[in-house]
Amino acid sequence: MLKKTALALAVLIASFDAQAAEALRVAADPIPHAQILEYVQKLDPQLQLKIIEIPNGVNSNELLAHGDVDANYFQHLPYLHSQEQALGQKFTVAATVHIEPLGIYSHRHTSFAQVPDKGTVAVPNNVTNLSRALYLLQANGLITLKPGFNDPAKDQATPKDIAENPRHLKILEIESPQIPRALDDVDLAVINGNYALEAGLSPAKDALELEKAQGNPYANILVTTPKLQDDPRIKQLAKDLNSPEVAKFITEKYAGSVIPVAVE
């Protein structure tokens, strides 16, 4: 299935190339990234963008490494670093744009006090967001990590690093895009902001608790290759993404569920 999806995506990218050879090809998650890029396109019509919405299961960093796109906009810096190691590639951060606070959600409970002994908690199964979820659970008094796990950006935690789990919570590692579907089956679910939005949730209203924006190391970034980092189109897109107009758009459209770095 993924091979068919990747093939279809390759055909889509090729058709974009045929339509506009000079357009900047940017791979993006549908929400909020592609929506933000669409606003940029309206804001700056002289900057030609080909926004390629990436389906779940397709690695935008592989597309970038292979030259199928010129940039991508979907990830945070810790995840990018893990991808550079996994793919043996070096990428370049062109702009730091917004934060999508990770949130803890529940369809069963309205407060953490209601979570029972041996309750179930769904968390992302990729390394960086799994660690991020554990730090958020710790920040809300549900678990305690071992000494030495102090910096979420540097000290990546796994369930083996839980020192105290007073409610004997069962940590279930699930593919990030699938976690919203598990809400009815678990006591708590830790969901990335973009997947919460895609599922029709409002992080600012529906989450029991969100990550704090101040000092958050998980800001979403525009990424390109070292070869293209000085491309005028990349520089203009980075400038647009960090503009007051885009910050205002993000603030008004997402109402605290997505936070522009400019007003963090």
Place the predicted regions along the sequence by residue.
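Periplasmic-binding protein-like
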Residues: 95-106, 131-138, 197-238, 241-264
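Ligand-binding "clamshell"
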Residues: 82-94, 107-109, 183-185, 190, ...
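Short helix-initiation/N-cap motifs at beta->coil->alpha
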Residues: 52-62, 149-181
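Short, polar/charged alpha-helical segment
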Residues: 23, 27-52, 59, 63
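Pocket-flanking alpha-helical
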Residues: 57-88, 104, 110, 196-200
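A conserved helix-loop-strand patch within extracytoplasmic ligand-binding domains
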Residues: 94-144, 247
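Beta->alpha turn/N-cap motifs
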Residues: 31-32, 55-57, 72-81, 98, ...
